Amino acid sequence: MKKQMVSLLLILSLILTLGLSACSKAAEEAQPAETEPVSLEPVIADYLAAEVGKDYDKADACIPTVYVVGTEEAENGDVTVYGDFWVENFDLKDDTLECVSGGHYPGVMQLKKDGDTYSVAKFDVPEDGAKFDESAKKLFGKYYDAWQKYSSDDAARKKQRTKAIADYVKANDLDVTQYQDYGWDPVTLPTK
């Protein structure tokens, strides 16, 4: 009888333990998920197309390429973004986007938080000419080496550019399979 009582108590303890652990897992699963971080790249791309792109002759498409090398968030939620940015304009010829103009804009953007959204409040770029390196070092600070590494890596820049163009083509449902720079062979866009 004593063995049966001990066995019964062990079984009840096991059932109680399993029941409580199942409840705690259900309670954990019921917790609200953390808020997904807001992607800053679309905010930056929209700014580049609207504000920097307007300085170029009109074309069929203005496609920014955004590469973020570092970010810093202030206590008020504003974000400083250090990056390598390109703005390029393309004309559509059959299934090809032909690059007709554009420019390189490495720099630092100040993004102001307003509720759940951001807007670009300020955009600083290095000085042109002989003071470029000196002003880029000052502007990028601790992110200078990361920016320099990316900006001198042709393969990485081409990969980022191709992705930006492919994303634009997909988002705008264009019948485009490639892009081309003047005097160069076309580059086939990924289909995924």
Where are these regions (language model features)?
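C-terminal motif of bacterial Sec signal peptides marking the signal peptidase cleavage site
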Residues: 18-22
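Bacterial N-terminal signal peptides that target proteins for export
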Residues: 1-9
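Bacterial signal peptide processing site
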Residues: 24-26
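Mature extracytoplasmic domains of secretory-pathway proteins
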Residues: 65-130
